[in-house]
């Protein structure tokens, strides 16, 4: 799609064909049919070694083994900071298109604004707008790609990034200890942890049953922390897409999910959350995803293989190579789906009119 916004498309009565997904990819559960299967865990007392820490750690480990996804409350991130970050994000997407498009990141730019981030070659696009920026390592920050509107964006997002980095490392400590390792092991395996923040805006959609806000995927990195509003739309599956649940929004909570890197480091013990985002025709939705990723040259290989197990990777590889392979598989799948769609469309064109509308 050429640079632009979804604003004008959101007001149409029919969904643009660029967003219409094949039937097997369409939502099976509505955005507001919530499930309470995803654990909500209070972190109050997690620093009390002789207090509640043991029970909190047990709950986190169980959630990672069963789902790879859970929610945390009492996490220590200031509520005013969360409110400011949310307000600024909403204000950014309410800006006139020309203000957002000053930070257009199409064409390979690192950071900024884009409509429907998707793999090159994909036939179908996601129904979302995003603004993204890279906040760690600090030395690599390119403030020219960070929005300068609304006022206060940089100051608040810097503080938010710092607090989320701290929370992510604390959660990785828990998982390291559960694996029988030193508590810094998972963080150290990232070498020089990268942090990317993606603010997602999902406008109202004229035909939400035909599309997705964000297609089904697992995150490539170590761990992701998601702040979402109360609308609903985040969905997860743990049976390879046979059944989906919509995660119940919890005020002030962060949804935490493990990525592929975390999955491999645990030798498959902790699941990489399989998830997607659906949209609706009643209201827009906002979410802020903080991706904690390893450095490109970090090693991807199990940190510990338990007795009786085999390593789930044949050999160590770098995160850059792991990511390249993942994107390669996704691109090939997208190419095959695009060819299949073109073939179906071609057959429809070749049909007599009376058969097409029969």
Swiss-Prot record:
User: What does the record give as EC number?
Assistant: 1.14.11.9
Give the consequence of mutating residue 158 to K: In strain: cv. Me-0, cv. Mh-0, cv. Per-1 and cv. Ws-0
Broad EC category: oxidoreductase
Which pathway does this polypeptide act in?
Answer: Secondary metabolite biosynthesis; flavonoid biosynthesis
Q: Which residues bind Fe cation?
A: 217, 219, 275
- UniProt-listed SUPFAM superfamilies: Clavaminate synthase-like
Provide an example Pfam family for this protein: 2OG-FeII_Oxy
Q: Which GO terms describe its molecular function?
A: ATP binding; flavanone 3-dioxygenase activity; L-ascorbic acid binding; metal ion binding
Q: How is the cofactor bound?
A: Binds 1 Fe(2+) ion per subunit.
Q: What is the effect of changing residue 350 to A?
A: In strain: cv. Cha-0, cv. Con, cv. Cvi-0, cv. Gr-5, cv. Ita-0, cv. Kas-1, cv. La-0, cv. Ler, cv. Me-0, cv. Mh-0, cv. Nc-1, cv. Per-1, cv. Ri-0, cv. Rsch-0, cv. Rub-1, cv. Tul-0, cv. Ws-0 and cv. Yo-1
Offer one example of a GO biological process linked to this entry: flavonoid biosynthetic process
Keyword annotations for this protein, in alphabetical order, are: ATP-binding, Dioxygenase, Flavonoid biosynthesis, Iron, Metal-binding, Nucleotide-binding, Oxidoreductase, Vitamin C
Where in the numbering of this chain does the Fe2OG dioxygenase domain appear?
190-294
- Which PROSITE patterns did the record assign? FE2OG_OXY (PS51471)
**What is the stated purpose of this protein?**
Catalyzes the 3-beta-hydroxylation of 2S-flavanones to 2R,3R-dihydroflavonols which are intermediates in the biosynthesis of flavonols, anthocyanidins, catechins and proanthocyanidins in plants.
Subunit details: Interacts with Dihydroflavonol-4-reductase (TT3), chalcone synthase (TT4) and chalcone isomerase (TT5) to form a flavonoid enzyme complex.
Q: Which family does it belong to?
A: Belongs to the iron/ascorbate-dependent oxidoreductase family.
Descriptive protein name: Naringenin,2-oxoglutarate 3-dioxygenase
Species: Arabidopsis thaliana
Question: What lineage, starting at the top, does this entry show?
Answer: Eukaryota, Viridiplantae, Streptophyta, Embryophyta, Tracheophyta
User: Gene name, please?
Assistant: F3H
């Amino acid at each position: 799609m050429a640079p632009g916004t979804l604003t004008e498309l959101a007001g149409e009565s029919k969904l643009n064909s660029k967003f219409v997904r094949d039937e097997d990819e369409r939502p099976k559960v509505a955005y507001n049919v919530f499930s309470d299967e995803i654990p909500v865990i209070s972190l109050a007392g997690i620093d009390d070694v002789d207090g509640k820490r043991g029970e909190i750690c047990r709950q986190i480990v169980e959630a990672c083994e069963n789902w790879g996804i859970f929610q945390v409350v009492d996490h220590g991130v200031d509520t005013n900071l969360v409110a400011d970050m949310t307000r600024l994000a909403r204000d950014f997407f309410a800006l006139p298109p020309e203000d957002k498009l000053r930070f257009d990141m199409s064409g390979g730019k690192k950071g900024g604004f884009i409509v429907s981030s998707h793999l090159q070659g994909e036939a179908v696009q996601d129904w979302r707008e995003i603004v993204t920026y890279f906040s760690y390592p600090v030395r690599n920050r390119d403030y020219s790609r960070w929005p300068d509107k609304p006022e206060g964006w940089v100051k608040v997002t810097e503080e938010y990034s710092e607090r989320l980095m701290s929370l992510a490392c604390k959660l990785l400590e828990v998982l390291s200890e559960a694996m029988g390792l030193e508590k810094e092991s998972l963080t150290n395996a990232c070498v020089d942890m990268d942090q990317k923040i993606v603010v997602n805006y999902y406008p109202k959609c004229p035909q939400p049953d035909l599309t997705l806000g964000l297609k089904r995927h697992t995150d490539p990195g170590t761990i992701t922390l998601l702040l979402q509003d109360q609308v609903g739309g985040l969905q997860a599956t743990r049976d390879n897409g046979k059944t989906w649940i919509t995660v119940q929004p919890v005020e002030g909570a962060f949804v935490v999910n493990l990525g592929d890197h975390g999955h491999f480091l645990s030798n498959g013990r902790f699941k990489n959350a399989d998830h997607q985002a659906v949209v609706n025709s009643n209201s827009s939705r906002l979410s802020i995803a903080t991706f904690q990723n390893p450095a490109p040259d970090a090693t991807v290989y199990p940190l510990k293989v338990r007795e009786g197990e085999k390593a789930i990777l044949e050999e160590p590889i770098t995160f850059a190579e792991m990511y390249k392979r993942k994107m390669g598989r996704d691109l090939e799948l997208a190419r095959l789906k695009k060819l299949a769609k073109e073939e179906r469309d071609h057959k429809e064109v070749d049909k007599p009119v009376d058969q097409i509308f029969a």
